[in-house]
Amino acid sequence: MISVAYAADAAHAAAHGAFYTEPHFWVDVAFILVVALAFKPVSRAIAAALDARSAKIKSRLDEAHKLREEAQEMLATYQRKQRDAMKEAEEIIAHAKAEAERLAKQAAKDLEVSMKRREQMAMDRIAQAEAQAVREVQNLAVDVAIGAAQKVIGESLSAAQTGSLVDNAIKDLPGKLH
Protein backbone atom coordinates (compact mmCIF):
# COMPACT_ATOMS: atom_id res chain seq x y z
CA MET A 1 0.00 0.00 0.00
CA ILE A 2 2.83 2.32 0.70
CA SER A 3 4.36 1.41 -2.60
CA VAL A 4 1.11 2.38 -4.36
CA ALA A 5 1.18 5.77 -2.63
CA TYR A 6 4.77 6.38 -3.70
CA ALA A 7 3.96 5.37 -7.24
CA ALA A 8 0.94 7.69 -7.30
CA ASP A 9 3.01 10.55 -5.88
CA ALA A 10 5.76 10.04 -8.46
CA ALA A 11 3.22 9.87 -11.25
CA HIS A 12 1.60 13.01 -10.04
CA ALA A 13 4.94 14.84 -9.82
CA ALA A 14 5.89 13.78 -13.34
CA ALA A 15 2.58 14.96 -14.70
CA HIS A 16 2.67 18.41 -13.08
CA GLY A 17 6.31 19.29 -13.08
CA ALA A 18 8.43 20.73 -10.23
CA PHE A 19 6.79 21.70 -6.89
CA TYR A 20 7.60 25.43 -7.27
CA THR A 21 5.55 25.55 -10.45
CA GLU A 22 2.38 24.69 -8.56
CA PRO A 23 0.06 27.55 -7.54
CA HIS A 24 -0.51 25.94 -4.11
CA PHE A 25 3.18 26.32 -3.39
CA TRP A 26 3.14 30.03 -4.15
CA VAL A 27 -0.03 30.57 -2.12
CA ASP A 28 1.68 28.85 0.77
CA VAL A 29 4.84 30.97 0.31
CA ALA A 30 2.75 34.17 0.10
CA PHE A 31 0.85 33.22 3.23
CA ILE A 32 4.10 32.54 5.10
CA LEU A 33 5.56 35.88 3.89
CA VAL A 34 2.44 37.82 4.88
CA VAL A 35 2.45 36.15 8.28
CA ALA A 36 6.20 36.79 8.68
CA LEU A 37 5.90 40.44 7.64
CA ALA A 38 2.75 41.07 9.68
CA PHE A 39 4.09 39.23 12.72
CA LYS A 40 6.26 42.08 14.02
CA PRO A 41 3.65 44.90 13.84
CA VAL A 42 0.84 42.61 14.92
CA SER A 43 2.91 41.24 17.79
CA ARG A 44 3.74 44.83 18.80
CA ALA A 45 0.06 45.77 18.69
CA ILE A 46 -0.88 42.67 20.66
CA ALA A 47 1.95 43.33 23.13
CA ALA A 48 0.88 46.99 23.44
CA ALA A 49 -2.73 45.95 24.00
CA LEU A 50 -1.63 43.36 26.55
CA ASP A 51 0.68 45.92 28.22
CA ALA A 52 -2.16 48.45 28.36
CA ARG A 53 -4.47 45.83 29.81
CA SER A 54 -1.72 44.81 32.27
CA ALA A 55 -1.19 48.47 33.28
CA LYS A 56 -4.94 48.92 33.72
CA ILE A 57 -5.13 45.78 35.86
CA LYS A 58 -2.07 46.91 37.84
CA SER A 59 -3.61 50.34 38.45
CA ARG A 60 -6.84 48.68 39.57
CA LEU A 61 -4.86 46.39 41.89
CA ASP A 62 -2.92 49.39 43.26
CA GLU A 63 -6.19 51.25 43.78
CA ALA A 64 -7.68 48.17 45.47
CA HIS A 65 -4.63 47.94 47.76
CA LYS A 66 -4.89 51.66 48.52
CA LEU A 67 -8.61 51.33 49.26
CA ARG A 68 -7.91 48.31 51.44
CA GLU A 69 -5.25 50.22 53.39
CA GLU A 70 -7.63 53.18 53.81
CA ALA A 71 -10.37 50.81 54.95
CA GLN A 72 -8.00 49.21 57.46
CA GLU A 73 -6.96 52.66 58.72
CA MET A 74 -10.62 53.68 59.04
CA LEU A 75 -11.41 50.42 60.82
CA ALA A 76 -8.51 50.96 63.22
CA THR A 77 -9.64 54.56 63.78
CA TYR A 78 -13.21 53.52 64.51
CA GLN A 79 -12.06 50.70 66.76
CA ARG A 80 -9.85 53.17 68.64
CA LYS A 81 -12.76 55.61 68.87
CA GLN A 82 -15.01 52.81 70.11
CA ARG A 83 -12.43 51.83 72.75
CA ASP A 84 -12.07 55.47 73.77
CA ALA A 85 -15.85 55.85 73.94
CA MET A 86 -16.15 52.70 76.05
CA LYS A 87 -13.37 53.94 78.34
CA GLU A 88 -15.05 57.34 78.62
CA ALA A 89 -18.40 55.66 79.33
CA GLU A 90 -16.78 53.56 82.06
CA GLU A 91 -15.19 56.69 83.53
CA ILE A 92 -18.55 58.49 83.44
CA ILE A 93 -20.23 55.53 85.14
CA ALA A 94 -17.49 55.36 87.79
CA HIS A 95 -17.74 59.11 88.34
CA ALA A 96 -21.53 58.89 88.58
CA LYS A 97 -21.27 56.06 91.13
CA ALA A 98 -18.73 58.01 93.18
CA GLU A 99 -20.89 61.12 92.98
CA ALA A 100 -23.97 59.12 94.02
CA GLU A 101 -22.07 57.68 96.99
CA ARG A 102 -20.83 61.14 97.93
CA LEU A 103 -24.34 62.56 97.66
CA ALA A 104 -25.75 59.69 99.74
CA LYS A 105 -23.12 60.30 102.44
CA GLN A 106 -23.79 64.03 102.32
CA ALA A 107 -27.55 63.42 102.56
CA ALA A 108 -27.02 61.12 105.55
CA LYS A 109 -24.77 63.72 107.18
CA ASP A 110 -27.28 66.50 106.46
CA LEU A 111 -30.08 64.33 107.86
CA GLU A 112 -28.06 63.69 111.00
CA VAL A 113 -27.33 67.41 111.42
CA SER A 114 -31.01 68.21 110.85
CA MET A 115 -32.08 65.57 113.36
CA LYS A 116 -29.62 66.95 115.94
CA ARG A 117 -30.87 70.48 115.31
CA ARG A 118 -34.50 69.36 115.68
CA GLU A 119 -33.58 67.43 118.81
CA GLN A 120 -31.87 70.53 120.20
CA MET A 121 -34.90 72.65 119.31
CA ALA A 122 -37.15 70.13 121.07
CA MET A 123 -34.85 70.13 124.09
CA ASP A 124 -34.92 73.96 124.12
CA ARG A 125 -38.71 73.93 123.95
CA ILE A 126 -38.83 71.40 126.77
CA ALA A 127 -36.45 73.56 128.83
CA GLN A 128 -38.58 76.63 128.11
CA ALA A 129 -41.73 74.73 129.05
CA GLU A 130 -40.05 73.54 132.26
CA ALA A 131 -38.91 77.09 133.09
CA GLN A 132 -42.39 78.39 132.33
CA ALA A 133 -43.92 75.68 134.54
CA VAL A 134 -41.46 76.50 137.35
CA ARG A 135 -42.30 80.22 137.06
CA GLU A 136 -45.99 79.45 137.06
CA VAL A 137 -45.56 77.19 140.12
CA GLN A 138 -43.43 79.86 141.83
CA ASN A 139 -45.96 82.57 140.99
CA LEU A 140 -48.75 80.34 142.22
CA ALA A 141 -46.78 79.59 145.41
CA VAL A 142 -46.11 83.32 145.89
CA ASP A 143 -49.80 84.08 145.33
CA VAL A 144 -50.79 81.33 147.76
CA ALA A 145 -48.19 82.53 150.31
CA ILE A 146 -49.30 86.15 149.92
CA GLY A 147 -52.90 85.10 150.27
CA ALA A 148 -52.08 83.03 153.35
CA ALA A 149 -49.93 85.83 154.78
CA GLN A 150 -52.70 88.35 154.19
CA LYS A 151 -55.18 86.06 155.84
CA VAL A 152 -52.89 85.40 158.84
CA ILE A 153 -51.81 89.05 159.13
CA GLY A 154 -55.35 90.25 158.62
CA GLU A 155 -56.59 87.98 161.41
CA SER A 156 -53.72 88.53 163.86
CA LEU A 157 -52.79 92.23 163.33
CA SER A 158 -54.81 95.32 163.72
CA ALA A 159 -55.38 97.86 160.95
CA ALA A 160 -52.76 100.24 162.39
CA GLN A 161 -50.14 97.49 162.55
CA THR A 162 -50.95 96.44 158.98
CA GLY A 163 -50.58 100.01 157.70
CA SER A 164 -47.26 100.36 159.50
CA LEU A 165 -45.93 97.13 157.89
CA VAL A 166 -47.01 98.32 154.42
CA ASP A 167 -45.30 101.69 154.92
CA ASN A 168 -42.04 100.00 156.02
CA ALA A 169 -42.16 97.62 153.04
CA ILE A 170 -42.60 100.55 150.65
CA LYS A 171 -39.60 102.33 152.19
CA ASP A 172 -37.39 99.23 151.85
CA LEU A 173 -38.48 98.57 148.24
CA PRO A 174 -35.98 100.91 146.45
CA GLY A 175 -33.02 99.27 148.22
CA LYS A 176 -34.16 95.79 147.32
CA LEU A 177 -34.72 96.55 143.64
CA HIS A 178 -31.15 97.70 142.97
Swiss-Prot record:
Top-level taxonomic group: Bacteria
GO molecular function, one term: proton-transporting ATPase activity, rotational mechanism
Topology within the bilayer: Single-pass membrane protein
Gene Ontology cellular component annotations, sorted alphabetically: plasma membrane; proton-transporting ATP synthase complex
Keywords, comma-separated and alphabetical: ATP synthesis, Cell inner membrane, Cell membrane, CF(0), Hydrogen ion transport, Ion transport, Membrane, Transmembrane, Transmembrane helix, Transport
Coiled-coil region: none
Annotated TM spans: 29-50
Cellular localization per UniProt: Cell inner membrane
Family designation: Belongs to the ATPase B chain family.
Record text on subunit structure and interactions: F-type ATPases have 2 components, F(1) - the catalytic core - and F(0) - the membrane proton channel. F(1) has five subunits: alpha(3), beta(3), gamma(1), delta(1), epsilon(1). F(0) has three main subunits: a(1), b(2) and c(10-14). The alpha and beta chains form an alternating ring which encloses part of the gamma chain. F(1) is attached to F(0) by a central stalk formed by the gamma and epsilon chains, while a peripheral stalk is formed by the delta and b chains.
The protein's role, per its UniProt record: F(1)F(0) ATP synthase produces ATP from ADP in the presence of a proton or sodium gradient. F-type ATPases consist of two structural domains, F(1) containing the extramembraneous catalytic core and F(0) containing the membrane proton channel, linked together by a central stalk and a peripheral stalk. During catalysis, ATP synthesis in the catalytic domain of F(1) is coupled via a rotary mechanism of the central stalk subunits to proton translocation. Component of the F(0) channel, it forms part of the peripheral stalk, linking F(1) to F(0).
Name the UniProt record assigns to this protein: ATP synthase subunit b
Organism: Paramagnetospirillum magneticum (strain ATCC 700264 / AMB-1) (Magnetospirillum magneticum)
Taxonomic lineage: Bacteria, Pseudomonadati, Pseudomonadota, Alphaproteobacteria, Rhodospirillales
